[in-house]
């Protein structure tokens, strides 16, 4: 499972990624990752493209924009994990224990990344 936020913006509120047909570049990386033909940086929330892992030929996307696009902000993700916990709690005992364990594993990794 991969999650992509096509709508991340910089400090000036400009989109970091050009979108539209260029999204195929990211989808290509995902397919190649699933095939095991490209590497990835492991993070608490999943694998991210390595520097240069997504073909940027012909695009006006700086390395700084790519850094921002792939940046994991632990506190933001920890807030997301709290929301996931509340959501799962609403389903009571019907939620498989493995989902609770995975959420906790991700949260623990994020706390470690945040230095706490």
What are these language model-derived features?
Residues 1-116:
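Flexible, glycine-rich loop/tail regions that form catalytic "lids" or insertion modules at the edges
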């Amino acid at each position: 499972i991969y999650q992509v936020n096509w709508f991340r913006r910089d400090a000036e509120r400009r989109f970091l990624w050009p979108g539209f047909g260029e999204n195929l570049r990211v989808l290509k990386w995902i397919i190649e990752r699933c095939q095991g033909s490209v590497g990835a940086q492991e993070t608490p929330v999943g694998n991210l493209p390595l520097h240069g892992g997504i073909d940027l030929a012909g695009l006006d996307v700086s390395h700084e924009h790519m850094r921002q696009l792939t940046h994991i902000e632990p506190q933001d993700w920890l807030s997301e994990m709290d929301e996931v916990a509340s959501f799962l709690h609403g389903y009571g005992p019907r939620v498989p224990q493995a989902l609770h364990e995975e959420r906790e594993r991700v949260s623990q990794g994020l706390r470690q990344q945040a230095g706490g």
